[in-house]
Swiss-Prot record:
GO cellular component term of the entry, any: host cell membrane
Name of protein: Protein OPG185
Pfam families noted in UniProt: V-set (PF07686)
Intravirion side: 304-315
4Fe-4S is among the record's keywords: no
Residues bearing glycans: N37, N69, N112, N161, N254
Subunit details: Heterodimerizes with OPG040. The heterodimer OPG185-OPG040 interacts with components of the entry fusion complex OPG143 and OPG094. Heterodimer with C3/VPC protein; disulfide-linked.
Role according to the record: Prevents cell to cell fusion by interacting with and directing the viral OPG040 protein on the host plasma membrane. The OPG185-OPG040 complex associates with components of the entry fusion complex (EFC) presumably to avoid superinfection and syncytium formation. Via its interaction with C3/VCP protein, protects the infected cell and probably also the extracellular enveloped virus from complement attack.
Origin organism lineage: Viruses, Varidnaviria, Bamfordvirae, Nucleocytoviricota, Pokkesviricetes
Length: 315
């Protein structure tokens, strides 16, 4: 009576043993293999199928026969000449490839001339993970992820004011002390002088006096004058810029000639110089010489052909 409980315990341990598991990620390749225990008998055929009722392949040496829409492009048989191991590789894993795969060996005895066939099968569970890291990689690396813990009580967290963490600092207004320093620059408006050559009238637009701001006992003055002369050939505008240094030198120079006023005079400006006329004459002469050369060459060719034609007619 004591043997029965022990036998039941052994049977329960055998059937309670989990299958070997292989965990892979989607898109990877999974290699499954089985080793047979009976190494004395002769292997007639090996087979692979997927539970519950899906036959994958039957293999006898290098001859492989696929079933249930499986192909060698999806599942390859990798041990055609090995009698001890049968191996397959499932390529480009998808979620549908997960499940329990069973390998089977069909063997006959090499010593007896009987037709008895022995049978061995082994199961392997394939897990296809959708995460970026597979379970087997986590186990092999030995890394564990523990959740973060907090020593604060829930009521402390509820009463905690989040606004105390993020304080918005209001910047102080930026004031500029006007009394301490003042940066100013004095500008003098342009003085535009327009002289009409045809009518002989001269008009001058004068601007208000410059505004001077004292800071370091110096004044920066830039004077820009424009003079527009209207002539029969067009309008000529000249620009002259005078700074403080030039004014100072002009004031101290005894040889400075005061400006003169133009009135009632007609100004004629020539845009062409002697050099320009020489270039135009040279280009014209070159064109004429080229035309004469072309004419001479044409006349010579025509005259030569005419003589040749006359000679042929005489003959």
């Amino acid at each position: 009576m004591t043997r029965l409980p022990i036998l039941l315990l052994l049977i329960s341990l055998v059937y309670a043993t989990p299958f070997p598991q292989t965990s892979k990620k989607i898109g990877d390749d999974a290699t499954l293999s089985c080793n047979r225990n009976n190494t004395n008998d002769y292997v007639v055929m090996s087979a692979w199928y997927k539970e519950p009722n899906s036959i994958i392949l039957l293999a006898a040496k290098s001859d492989v026969l696929y079933f249930d829409n499986y192909t060698k492009d999806k599942i390859s048989y990798d041990s055609p000449y090995d009698d001890l191991v049968t191996t397959i590789t499932i390529k480009s894993l998808t979620a549908r490839d997960a499940g329990t795969y069973v390998c089977a060996f069909f063997m006959t005895s090499t010593t007896n001339d009987t037709d008895k066939v022995d049978y061995e099968e082994y199961s392997t569970e394939l897990i296809v993970n959708t995460d970026s890291e597979s379970t087997i990689d986590i186990i092999l690396s030995g890394s564990t992820h523990s959740p973060e813990t907090s020593s604060e009580k829930p009521e402390d967290i509820d009463n905690f004011n989040c606004s105390s963490v993020f304080e918005i600092a209001t910047p102080e207004p930026i004031t500029d002390n006007v009394e301490d320093h003042t940066d100013t620059v004095t500008y003098t408006s342009d003085s535009i002088n327009t002289v009409s050559a045809s009518s002989g009238e001269s008009t001058t637009d004068e601007t208000p006096e410059p505004i001077t701001d004292k800071e370091e006992d110096h004044t920066v003055t830039d004077t820009v004058s424009y003079t527009t002369v209207s002539t029969s050939s067009g309008i000529v505008t000249t620009k002259s810029t005078t700074d403080d240094a030039d004014l100072y030198d002009t004031y101290n120079d005894n040889d400075t000639v005061p400006p003169t006023t133009v009135g009632g005079s007609t100004t004629s400006i020539s845009n062409y110089k002697t050099k320009d006329f020489v270039e135009i004459f040279g280009i014209t002469a070159l064109i004429i010489l080229s035309a004469v050369a072309i004419f001479c060459i044409t006349y010579y060719i025509y005259n030569k052909r005419s003589r040749k034609y006359k000679t042929e007619n005489k003959v």
